[in-house]
Design a protein with these regions (language model features):
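Anaerobic metallocofactor- and corrinoid-dependent redox/one-carbon enzyme cores
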Residues: 95, 397-398, 406-423, 432-435, ...
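Thiamine diphosphate
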Residues: 112-241, 246-250, 479, 484-502, ...
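Conserved acidic/glycine
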Residues: 1-51, 57-58, 147, 151, ...
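Short secondary-structure boundary/capping segments
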Residues: 69-74, 155-161, 186-197, 223-227, ...
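Cofactor-binding active-site loop characterized by glycine-rich and histidine/acidic residues
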Residues: 5-164, 393-395, 423, 427-435
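A glycine-rich helix N-cap at a beta->alpha junction
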Residues: 76-94, 161-177, 202-204, 405, ...
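Short helix/loop capping segments that flank catalytic or ligand/cofactor-binding pockets
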Residues: 63-65, 76-78, 150-152, 182-184, ...
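Acidic, glycine-rich active-site loops and adjacent beta-strand->loop/helix elements
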Residues: 57-61, 143-150, 175-181, 213-214, ...
């Protein structure tokens, strides 16, 4: 996909004019992504699961697109363009990373995606938000070991502590350790198994490490079956009235070489198992005969003629795919048409009488309390420990906080999650919204800037989603910004920063709105 503009089925020896004039894309992470995808197909097939695959290293789009073509999802959503035949395959490969084709990163045009694949660090929090209030949903989230160094990912490992297995689904995190970022070793790639077990046991997980390259399929199959069995055990206990206190959720550590299966060495540089495989391992294949031959040998090693005779799938591939189209990773309805509208509440019941003094936030809290009461499973509030300081505590009249590791707020159906990480709140909100529900994120003006770029990335996803014909409606993501520059009260200069509002205003009006309310009734 990165390389070819012709002869995509290798029906003859590659020539220089078969290779694209400009080579764009990322190869290094793709082997791990496609390995996990193939095993998830088998897991879904064997257990009839509702599953979403959230891919943290979204620059590995070639892996996702290849899998989506193989399972027929591209053909479903782009009929006549990317059908599961030789023409559809040629279109997919030759148009990749060029105008009019798929971009090099996963985005809203990618079936099955609920996460913009550019900025790293947010996949895990999005995954946990997606499974809240969806008891039958399992999200497998692959986190690259480079992405795992980010602050948002570091705090998102704690998200299991906010997941009630009685009412919600489950996330199976897979830490993909291939050892390298763009040009440097990763922290996790330099940790041994004991160090990884100690770290993630401290977070509250139990680990299965998959690293035997000679038996990788057997090991990964066993690991996934184990992880699913552990999930079901935790959920069964909670749903039968005997929840496990501080359950240790499963996660998998997958160790494979970066760029596994690609060229081992080019021009004296180690490629497979090094950072040199991160992007384009044969960057001169369009003008160098030696690299062209290396490309020919590499692509021929996959025996395309056996796997895709005349561009059609061999039975060996078909027999690993989910039997039902609606269960395929690219076709689960939760990822593209999930919207559940809220039951509305009459705002007039909360109107403030003329010439009276009222706190606009207290009135808002009372209104939201009623909304939460009318919508017990389709709305949540994610707050960075600011519910009461923002005078929204009336919400607690109809619901409670949800913190599963606290004996006083576990297993009570609480709709309010308070975690002192704006990144985690934003990630939860995105995942919850993109799977059809509605969420609210209240915070002080100066601190919403922490999620400025997350918000912008999300707006890109929504912009493209609105342009894609096969995606349905979604709720908005909703911020309540308080303690603004116009009304500081006791906080002062330290809490003045209108840049978040400015960032929202920079987004086109069809995608974003800012409302300034002069008095309580208008809130």
């Amino acid at each position: 996909m990165i390389f070819l503009r012709d002869n995509v089925l290798l029906e003859s020896e590659l020539q220089l004019d078969h290779v694209k004039p400009r080579l764009l894309g990322h190869w290094g992470t793709c082997p791990g992504i496609i390995l996990v995808w193939s095993h998830l197909n088998l897991l879904i097939r064997n257990h009839d699961l509702d599953m979403i695959y959230v891919i943290g290293p979204g620059h590995g789009a070639p892996a996702a697109l290849a899998a989506l073509w193989l399972e027929g999802s591209l053909g479903k959503f782009y009929p006549g363009e990317y059908d599961r035949d030789a023409t559809g395959l040629r279109n997919l490969i030759t148009r990749f990373s060029v105008p009019g084709g798929f971009p090099s990163h996963i985005n809203a045009e990618t079936p099955g995606s609920i996460h913009e694949g550019g900025e790293l660090g947010y996949a895990l929090a999005v995954s946990f938000g997606a499974v809240m209030d969806k008891p039958d949903l399992v999200v497998t989230c692959i986190v690259g070991d480079g992405e795992a160094e980010t602050g948002p990912t570091a705090t998102a490992w704690h998200a299991i502590k906010y997941l009630d297995p009685k009412e919600s689904g489950a996330v199976i995190p897979i830490l993909h350790v291939n050892g390298f970022k763009i040009s440097e070793r990763t922290i996790f790639g330099c940790m041994d198994d004991k160090e990884l077990v100690c770290l993630f046991s401290g977070y509250g997980y139990q680990l299965c490490i998959v690293d035997d390259l000679d038996n990788i399929n057997d090991e990964l199959y066993t690991a996934m079956e184990w992880a699913l069995a552990e999930v079901k055990k935790i959920q069964k206990a909670a749903r039968s009235g005997n929840p496990i206190v501080k359950p240790r959720w499963p996660m998998i550590v997958l160790r494979t070489p970066k760029g596994w299966g690609g060229p081992k060495e080019v021009d004296g540089k180690i490629i497979e198992g090094s950072f040199h495989s991160h992007q384009v391992p044969l960057s001169k294949a369009n003008n160098d005969e030696t690299q062209l031959q290396a490309l020919n040998d590499w692509l021929s090693s996959y025996k395309i003629d056996e796997l895709l005779p005349e561009g059609k799938l061999a039975d060996a591939i078909i027999n690993t795919l989910p039997k039902k189209d609606e269960k395929k990773l690219g076709q689960l309805k939760d990822t593209y048409d999930p919207y559940i509208a809220l039951k509305t509440v009459k705002w007039e019941d909360f109107a403030v009488e003329k010439n009276t003094d009222q706190s606009c936030m207290k009135i808002t809290g009372a209104y939201l309390s009623k909304v939460f009461g009318e919508n017990p499973t389709t709305i949540r509030l994610f707050s960075p420990d600011e519910l009461e300081s923002n005078k929204l505590d009336a919400i607690l009249d109809h619901t409670q906080r949800n913190f599963q590791w606290d004996e006083y707020s576990r297993a009570n159906g609480g709709r309010v999650i308070e975690t002192l990480s704006e990144h985690e709140c934003q990630g939860f909100m995105q995942g919850y919204t993109l799977t059809g529900r509605t969420a609210i994120f209240p915070s002080y003006e100066s601190f919403l800037g922490i999620v400025h770029t997350m918000m912008v990335q999300y707006s890109k996803f929504v912009k493209i989603a609105n342009e894609v014909k096969w995606r349905g409606d979604l709720a908005s993501i909703n911020y309540i910004e308080t303690s603004t520059w116009a009304r500081q009260e006791h906080n002062g200069f330290s809490h003045q920063n209108p840049s978040f509002i400015g960032a929202v205003l920079n987004i086109k009006a069809e995608a974003a709105r800012v409302r300034h309310h002069p008095y309580a009734t208008l809130v």
